[in-house]
Amino acid sequence: MYKVVLLRHGESIWNMENRFTGWTDVDLSPKGIEEAKQAGKILKEKGFTFDAAFTSVLKRAIRTLWIVLDELDLMWIPVYKSWRLNERHYGALQGLNKAETAKKYGEEQVKLWRRSAEVRPPALTKDDPRYPGNDPRYADLSEDEIPLTENLIDTINRVIPYWESTIAPTIKSGKRVIIAAHGNSLRGLVKYLDNLSNEEIMELNIPTGIPLVYELDENLKPIRHYYLADEEELKKKQQEVAEQGKARA
């Protein structure tokens, strides 16, 4: 049996401000730093250790991983960063407040933009300063690989090749792996691992800073999964994620 730990980054400054973030490179909030520390502490308490770590090229995930590895005294292990683990690209919504957007377009539309597997938010244009092609960290990507917007399927289509080519072989080689990434890149991976339908994935909310453990068989098919959190805390944090896209009076 293999184990892999999935961890959504701690609360970011834009999570705190309830903004669509996507590929915008915002840092952790003070609460997010504390969430990452707590994640590291609970992993240590439960006896977890790691031989390799994977994360995105966005600092909220990278810093979460650093903090966790620091708590575990594992800052020396190899860390592999890939744009393929980035958050889903939210197109022209990036930077907008989710509740204000829900007020303007309706909660149902915003839920589709946030949670649907197939609906894409309005796209960026290439002359928009937010276009990732202007960012040196994506200099090696072809123009086709740089998104102007993404739905969850698009996100899955970049996450899963990286899982299959790089992460899965690392796990199969016997290395203990942690993946620190984002709400939607992890939802995409969970959809793939658990073979969830497009309808089922709409209702899945992954909270910030709570380790999610997958136990996998020899073919890396899930045996079971569980969060390292008590039921009450988990439900509260999942509900907070679900509420983000609702209009406020």
From Swiss-Prot:
HAMAP family this protein is in?
A: PGAM_GpmA (MF_01039)
Q: What is this protein called?
A: 2,3-bisphosphoglycerate-dependent phosphoglycerate mutase
Catalytic residues identified in the record: H9, E87
Task of the protein: Catalyzes the interconversion of 2-phosphoglycerate and 3-phosphoglycerate.
Keyword annotations for this protein, in alphabetical order, are: Gluconeogenesis, Glycolysis, Isomerase
Top-rank taxon of the source lineage equals Bacteria
The record's PROSITE patterns line, in alphabetical order, gives:
PG_MUTASE
Family assignment?
Belongs to the phosphoglycerate mutase family. BPG-dependent PGAM subfamily.
Q: Which reaction does it catalyse?
A: (2R)-2-phosphoglycerate = (2R)-3-phosphoglycerate
What are the GO MF terms of this UniProt record?
A: phosphoglycerate mutase activity
GO BP of this protein: gluconeogenesis; glycolytic process
Which Pfam families does the record associate with it? His_Phos_1 (PF00300)
Q: Which residues bind substrate?
A: 8-15, 21-22, 60, 87-90, 98, 114-115, 183-184
Gene designation per UniProt: gpmA
User: Site Transition state stabilizer: which residues?
Assistant: H182
Protein species of origin: Caldanaerobacter subterraneus subsp. tengcongensis (strain DSM 15242 / JCM 11007 / NBRC 100824 / MB4) (Thermoanaerobacter tengcongensis)
Which pathway, per its entry? Carbohydrate degradation; glycolysis; pyruvate from D-glyceraldehyde 3-phosphate: step 3/5
